[in-house]
């Protein structure tokens, strides 16, 4: 799989800014595997094959199992995800689909139960970046 545009070559400053954001997010204490699940779920919703290919490899490198990756699009019914992961996935879906609905208060409240304010900002920035 290849991207249509080589963003690093076409806009190196913008690419470096995104790398800076990624570095910041990874320094906020969120688990690497959680971040990859979030990126994969947003990519599933967005139908981005290139992103799914890249982030499934990154998720495996972060310790994710094949079974959890295969069932990610059915995470609500699958028993393999923790309450924290479920809160992150619900937050990811709500933000990714924000044009269709506002983020429900219940989704926000559940996310706040599992994530500090700093972690939720990092999670939000991850979703914003993958959706950009």
Task: Give the ranges of each region predicted by the language model.
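Hydrophobic alpha-helical segments
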Residues: 1-132
